[in-house]
Regions:
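Short membrane-interface helical motifs at transmembrane helix boundaries
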Residues: 123-154, 344-356
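Membrane-interface helix-loop junctions in multi-pass transport and translocation proteins
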Residues: 190-224, 228, 355
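Residue-level recognition of transmembrane alpha-helices
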Residues: 36, 43, 70-73, 117, ...
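Interhelical loop/hinge segments that connect adjacent transmembrane helices in multipass membrane
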Residues: 2, 10-34, 215, 226-268
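Signature of the first transmembrane helix
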Residues: 30-91, 95, 259-279
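Structural signal for membrane-spanning alpha-helices in multi-pass inner-membrane proteins
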Residues: 128, 171, 197, 201, ...
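Helix-terminus/linker motif at the lipid-water interface of multi-pass membrane proteins
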Residues: 44, 48-66, 136-143, 199-206, ...
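Small-residue-rich hydrophobic transmembrane alpha-helices
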Residues: 66-126, 163-182, 290-353
Length: 356
């Protein structure tokens, strides 16, 4: 499904903020790579602090705790995947208006997206906590793992607002070409998470509960940093908390792009709940092996995900300014780069598979 928005291109280009990147001019390949690299680094750190969670509980708590933390990913990703689809819709709309030099429309889209995030955060907290017993039942969770999973998920969903605000805020920054500062914030968040993991588990003996609290505190830190930057932003995506409201025409545009992506990501994640259910039949040891595999799989796919996000911003800005051919060229170049990177990464994974 294609969504075409009509923009008036006679507006003068506004002064760009320091970290903004205009992708409507210059080398397509250079823009994609320069934009994707901070995204890749940020995603690696995000995976790193997820791995730290599982490493800490696996080494200092128990094998059951390792399985519990590592195998709740499909449940979390079902809700997070839906939200990420919606936030991608906001990013597409913002990048198109930004490319078309419509700062007043960018302003409306930013404030609509952030208020939508707050509403979804409240809903996800309630739905996530309420769904946890049902999802664990669908996953056929072994009795020895279920208590730890319930504790982890309840705390995680209670603090999910931070994750949503960070993801929407960083998506807004990426829409105007700024992929560096979201990376810096993830770097800080990863450091906070690692320190708190070790403090809560080793010093206070909090086990899975400590790891969950460390995660939501770290996510809250990244959210505060992102919102602070948007509030102080010298550009069209400047956020004013007093101006938060739903602009209904803008919401329709965001939903039109976001819902298909949201459903795709949520359904894919939800299907993994049943896959995890089959794995869980074999007990905690098999669950631990599956957890280790999924971590490797996630690392390999990160470069392609980063290029995908880079191409979203590139295409959005160029469609906004009316340069359809350049947008198509960006998609082709992103596909070429993705195939090349995947081919390179497949070699060590296949060769080292027995040892991994």
């Amino acid at each position: 499904m294609q969504h075409h928005f009509h923009f008036h291109l006679h507006h003068h280009a506004p002064r760009r903020a320091r970290y903004d990147v205009d992708m409507t001019q210059g080398s397509t390949t250079r823009h994609l790579i320069n934009f994707a690299l901070p995204l890749l680094a940020g995603n690696l750190f995000q995976q790193l602090y997820n791995m730290v969670d599982t490493w800490v509980v696996g080494n200092f708590v128990s094998n059951e705790a390792f399985s519990a933390v590592g195998t709740v990913t499909p449940i979390i990703n079902t809700l997070i995947g839906f939200f990420l689809g919606m936030s991608s819709g906001a990013g597409v709309v913002i990048s198109q208006y930004y490319g078309a030099h419509r700062p007043e429309k960018v302003h409306e889209a930013v404030h609509t997206a952030m208020l939508l995030t707050i509403v979804m955060g409240v809903v996800f907290t309630g739905v996530g906590i309420a769904m946890t017993p049902l999802m664990l039942e669908l996953m056929k969770t072994p009795a020895e793992v279920a208590p730890d999973q319930t504790v982890y998920l309840t705390i995680y969903f209670a603090g999910i607002m931070g994750l949503l605000l960070y993801n929407m805020g960083s998506g807004i920054l990426r829409a105007v070409g700024d992929s560096r500062r979201p990376f810096y914030f993830l770097l800080v968040s990863a450091g906070v998470n690692t320190a708190l993991d070790l403090l809560f588990v080793l010093k206070f003996g909090m086990g899975v509960e400590g790891v969950a609290y460390a995660t939501i505190i770290a996510q809250a830190v990244s959210a505060v940093l992102t919102i602070a930057v948007l509030v102080r932003y010298d550009g069209s995506v400047k956020l004013s908390l007093r101006k938060l409201r739903i602009h209904w025409d803008m919401l329709k545009k965001i939903v039109a792009v976001g819902i298909p992506a949201a459903l795709q990501m949520a359904i894919t994640a939800f299907s993994n709940v049943f896959v995890q259910g089959y794995i869980n039949h074999f007990g905690a040891d098999c669950m631990s092996g599956w957890t280790a595999y999924t971590k490797i799989d996630q690392l390999v796919i990160l470069p392609v995900q980063s290029l995908s996000l880079a191409s979203t911003t590139f295409v959005g800005q160029n469609l906004g300014v009316g340069n359809v051919e350049r947008a198509k060229g960006g998609v082709r170049q992103a596909l070429y780069l993705s195939v090349a990177v995947t081919a390179v990464l497949l070699v060590p994974v296949l060769l080292l598979a027995p040892d991994l």
